[in-house]
């Protein structure tokens, strides 16, 4: 659907403007997070018969909620599908002027992502997509990015997108009186209005770290998000949890939260899968009361890639000693499979490659 395409100059992200790429064959830039090639949910809908013919059983979608980046791991609104991949029914002019990087002037972007009619229409299109996926006997898993959100998020609103929009509360960046202030940790309590001293995940100011221990309301809100999308009318079949072990500020709280998340999701949809991104030993999360399983890096992706190509996924280093080395391959598989209980092993996401690593 070309009517929802991100426009060049629609808004600014990490110091430069959004770019609509017209040449499908263009190689993405190294920092190509603001480049958009026009894909959307309608495009997925149009390809469902093809995917079914390929024998696809499950479609795992990278984040689909409102976000300024093309990867969308910096969520702006957990309750709504991004109209840029959904449906835009209310639009306007208002691209940024040349040289302007102030997103409070990005009137077109603001209309597209804050107008409730666009958000409602996009959620409805997503509902239709899930219905069509299920009608073909396939499943769909959403990506849940709950460790951090984005600086554009309406709870933070560093870009002042929601500041003057009817129906939205003040973001925590905007005002010390924001209802979302406790959702984040601020280092300087005397910098409001427009307080930039919030904690970012790995110090990234575009990825504000969510402060679960300091906000019961935040915990309730994210549990509600977990329930919402696996429940009618959306009926998604599960969650893939981004950097799941990083959530919270302590290991004890992390386990506590995922136990509560599991209860919320399974009460809403007992068959929903809870699949975590995790590097290292996941045993303590796989005791039956937190995650169901994991993305299988250690006991599949890494050893298979070493054996067949000699490439180490994380560093892209070529390891001639591992290329075709059956002893190293079998040893790695056996060693890491011991960390997965039988149910988790059978249900693990076994990938040759994904968005976080070099392609196979």
State each model region's role.
Residues 56, 233-236:
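A structural motif
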Residues 130, 134-136, 147-148, 152-190, ...:
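Active-site-proximal helices and loops of the catalytic beta/alpha 8
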Residues 204-208, 242-247, 343-360:
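Active-site clefts of carbohydrate-active enzymes
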Residues 1, 60-62, 141-145, 242-244, ...:
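A cross-family glycoside hydrolase active-site/sugar-binding cleft signature
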Residues 1-139, 147-149, 154, 201-204, ...:
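N-terminal structural segment of carbohydrate-active enzymes
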Residues 51, 61, 78, 133, ...:
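Conserved, mostly hydrophobic/aromatic
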Residues 219-228, 232-233:
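Radical SAM [4Fe-4S] cluster-binding motif and immediate context
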